Regions:
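N-terminal maturation segment of proteins
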Residues: 1-258
Length: 258
């Protein structure tokens, strides 16, 4: 729900298209004629599926994580709407927030006690998920590839660690200790944004100098994520605009709020 509204109400989306968020709100809350509240439909669907014998139950860790992040994203809906020029959304938005909060309580009381505590999937489902991502190798082949890749990266870290230790004046060159100490020197807030922008300017210069690819006329866009966006995706990523009917919307790099 949060991701859908955030995409629709992006500042690059024309106001005429953003108006559809008001229609969507009424449909989600069941206020539109012929529609039931989205949360009630979700309850019915989950209840229906849980009664099927032999069906794999959801993983407890995933459900718990969703329950912890949901309140942040529910509150984040307010900021998404407030950042637009839309009017007349508050009553329906308040209702949606109440419905989503009640739904979370229902999940905690009804679904969470009936979850599985092992994240492992049956082999068939695991292979199916791999194929959905275009991976045809067997799990055993992937394990071998991963082990070789890990050893290669470890060897590179062992070679680089002494150089980093010398530059940072560390009293150890063990790559594990070097990584631990680097993690204590994280950059936060405005300093992080400044670092990202400076690095992107350097990358743009190198790409242009070497003629690697064509670049847009304007600099790359980067911004700090909101608390709700960070809860949804707590890692740096690129927000790709729609490919169909794009009216000049640009991709934007999103930096998590840490």
């Amino acid at each position: 729900v949060f991701a859908g509204f955030r995409g629709l109400l992006d500042k690059q989306v024309p106001i005429e298209r953003q108006q559809q968020a008001l229609v969507r709100l009424k449909k989600y809350t069941g206020q539109a004629e012929g529609y039931e509240p989205l949360t009630e439909l979700a309850k019915l669907r989950l209840t229906e599926r849980s009664e099927i014998p032999g069906l794999i139950k959801p993983f407890a860790g995933e459900v718990q994580q969703d329950l912890e992040r949901s309140p942040i994203m529910i509150e984040g809906l307010q900021g998404v709407f407030e950042a637009t020029e839309l009017e007349g959304y508050q009553e329906d938005l308040d209702l949606l927030k109440v419905q989503l909060t009640a739904y979370n309580s229902w999940v905690e009381e009804t679904i969470l006690p009936n979850t599985r505590y092992s994240a492992a999937l049956p082999r068939e489902l695991y292979e199916l998920q791999l194929k959905n991502y275009g991976v045809d190798d067997s799990p055993e082949a992937l394990i071998r590839t991963g082990q070789v890749g890990f050893m290669n990266i470890r060897n590179e870290m062992m070679a680089l660690a002494p150089l980093v230790a010398q530059q940072k004046s560390y009293d150890t060159s063990d790559y594990r200790e070097v990584i631990k100490r680097l993690k204590t020197e994280q950059v936060h807030g405005d300093e992080l944004m400044a670092s990202y922008r400076e690095t992107m300017r350097e990358l743009d210069f190198i790409i242009g100098r070497e003629g690697l690819v064509s670049l847009p006329d304007e600099p790359a866009r980067v911004r700090m994520a909101t608390a709700a966006e960070t809860a949804q995706q707590p890692a740096a990523h690129i927000d790709i605009p729609r490919l169909v009917c794009n009216t000049g919307e640009f991709p934007e790099f999103i930096v998590p709020k840490i």
